[in-house]
Every structure is written in C-alpha cells, then in structure tokens.
C-alpha cells in the first residue's frame, strides 16, 4: 500500500499529550485563584509580620534534636507514599524508581494547585510502567480515597482523646446556602449527560478496590502506606512543636494538623501552600498556643516538608524525565 501524497517520509502523528491544559479559560481561572491566594498570603504576612519574625527567630533557637526527628519523619513520608502507591496496583512496580517518583511528585505538587502536579507525575510514571491510562488514573483515585478515609479515621480516633478541641462552627446563612446549593447540585447530577461517564469511572474504581483486596499484601501496603504517610506528617508537626516548646500536648497537635490539612485539601492551592499554613496556625492559636510559637511551628513544618526538599525534588524530576521514566 502506498502512502498518500505529501505524507511520504513523514513520521506518524503522535497522540495528544495527556498533560496538556484543559483550556485557556481553565488556565486563567487557576492562575486567578493562585494569584488571589498569593496576594492574600502576602497581606496576612504583612499584617502579622511581627509574629512571623518572632516565630522565625524562635525556630532558629529550637532544639536541634527534635528538628532532626522531624527531618527523619519527613524523609519517611516519601517511602510511605511509595508503599501506598504500590498497594494501589496489582502489578509490581520498580522500587527505587517508585520512591524517586514520589519524591519528584511532592516537588511538582507545590507548583500546581489541587494536587495536579503530583497526579500528573504519578500518572505518567504508572503508564511508563505499562499500566493503561484508565488503570493508572484508577490507581491514583484508589490511593486518594484510601488516604482520605485513613485521615478521617485518625481524626475520629483522636477526637475522643482531646475532648472539646474540635468544635463545629456555628452555621451562618451563607454556609447554609452553600450547603443547600451543593446538595441540589448532587441531586441533579444523575440527570446530567456526564452521569453515565461518572458512573462508569466510579464502577471501575470500586472494581479496582475489590481486586486489590483479594491480594492481602497489596491491601496491607495500601492502607499501611496511607496510615504511615498521615502519621509521619503528624510526627513532623509534633517534632517541630516540641522543638519550639509549643505548650500543647502531642495528641492535640496531631489532631489539629489532621483537621487543618483535611480542610486545606478543599482549597486549590499548590501543595496546600497558604491554605494549610493559615488553617494550621489558626487552629494552634485558637487552641491556646502563642502566636509566635504557632508561626514557628508552621514555618518549621514547611521548611522540612517543602522548602528544603523542593530543589532536590525538581532535580530528581528532571532526571526521571531525561531517563524516560516519566
């Protein structure tokens, strides 16, 4: 068979890239949200600059032993994430590249909002390991669902040990209106044309979860990795709090972190930057911690989990891309 005129010698057309942006409008919306969050963060930083400056000074004189504990726990979070990702797929993944991909994904997660960076890196890695696109996306959904369930279970487990610490907010008319609108949207979802696609995706995720639980080793890896990931992040906050002598018990600090991080996950900011910082600092302050100690705790947590590993993580990301592991 001869080639059509004008196409002889040309390479075959490549499929569209999976990681192209959904559209200029969505990109502008994400950029607008990110700009608003950054401006809000700058405003809060300027308004509370004395507390931030005092917190940074207090962090400089913190106990180095506790900071070392926090740094060790931060290193363990990438291994825990790799364990959970392995538990979300039946196929055996290359261990060293899996850990490196989680390290790179954590760095990419701080550049794009709502987990898009980490999701793109992990999706690409799983596809490079031979999983189809649908199965790769399903594995990410399984891991995210298990992580959310583990986080909620830890909150429910720690809340009785810290009575009165988590107080439900008083509902305002605006909150009630937003909740009512969300319920109306959920009720109208089955009538939309996209419902069939959503139902097929949900059915596929549930099928993947059932298949994983037929293999006990994968189920233990999934739930154990998610539990270790949440516990190690809590340990980082506890260690920094102990290093700066935050006057709150460790269980309360862990519960406040889990609640603040769960709330911050609803806001589309890169890696929770800004949203988690504000939520955690507010939770610690409302619970009785001094503003300077709360600020230094948040700064120390961010230093160990974001700023110190950010550049090495981006370098690892570049190496993985160069070696076609992503």
For the regions a protein language model found, what residue spans apply to each?
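Hydrophobic alpha-helical membrane segments of integral membrane proteins
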Residues: 124-125, 140, 152-153
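Mid-bilayer segments of alpha-helical transmembrane spans in multi-pass integral membrane proteins
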Residues: 106, 110-116, 144-156
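Transmembrane alpha-helix interface/packing and boundary motifs in multi-pass membrane proteins
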Residues: 105-113, 258-277
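Re-entrant/interfacial helical elements at transmembrane boundaries that shape
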Residues: 87, 117-129, 157, 270-286
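Transmembrane helix-loop junction
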Residues: 90, 110, 128, 242-243, ...
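C-terminal halves and exits of single transmembrane alpha-helices
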Residues: 103-119, 232, 304
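Predominantly cytoplasmic-facing regulatory/coupling regions of multi-pass membrane proteins
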Residues: 1-103, 161-265, 291-296, 304-326
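Membrane-interface alpha-helices at helix entry/exit sites of multi-pass transporters
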Residues: 97-100, 114, 118-119, 128-145, ...
């Amino acid at each position: 068979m001869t080639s059509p005129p004008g196409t002889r010698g040309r390479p075959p057309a490549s499929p569209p890239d999976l990681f192209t942006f959904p559209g200029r409008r969505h990109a502008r919306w994400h950029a607008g949200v990110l700009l608003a969050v950054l401006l809000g963060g700058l405003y809060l930083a300027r308004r509370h600059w004395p507390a931030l400056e005092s917190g940074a000074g207090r962090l400089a004189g913190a106990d180095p032993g506790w900071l070392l504990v926090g740094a060790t726990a931060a290193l363990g979070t990438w291994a825990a994430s790799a364990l959970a990702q392995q538990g979300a797929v039946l196929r055996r993944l290359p261990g060293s590249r899996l850990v490196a991909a989680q390290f790179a994904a954590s760095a990419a997660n701080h550049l794009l909002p709502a987990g898009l960076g980490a999701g793109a890196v992990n999706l690409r890695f799983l596809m490079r390991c031979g999983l189809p696109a649908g199965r790769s996306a399903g594995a990410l959904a399984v891991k995210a669902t298990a992580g959310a369930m583990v986080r909620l279970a830890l909150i429910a487990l720690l809340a009785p040990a810290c009575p009165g610490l988590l107080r439900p907010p008083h509902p305002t008319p605006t909150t009630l209106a937003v909740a009512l609108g969300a319920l109306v949207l959920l009720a109208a979802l089955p009538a939309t044309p996209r419902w069939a696609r959503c139902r097929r995706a949900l059915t596929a995720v549930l099928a993947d979860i059932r298949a994983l639980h037929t293999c006990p080793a994968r189920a233990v890896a999934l739930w154990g990795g998610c539990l270790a990931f949440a516990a190690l992040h809590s340990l980082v906050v506890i260690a920094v709090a102990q290093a700066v002598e935050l006057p709150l018990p460790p269980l309360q600090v862990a519960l406040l972190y889990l609640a603040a991080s769960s709330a911050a996950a609803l806001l589309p900011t890169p890696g929770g930057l800004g949203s988690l910082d504000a939520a955690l600092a507010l939770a610690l302050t409302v619970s009785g911690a001094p503003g300077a100690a709360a600020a230094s705790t948040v700064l120390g947590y961010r230093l160990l989990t974001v700023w110190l590993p950010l550049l090495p993580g981006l370098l690892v990301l570049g190496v993985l891309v160069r070696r076609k592991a992503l």
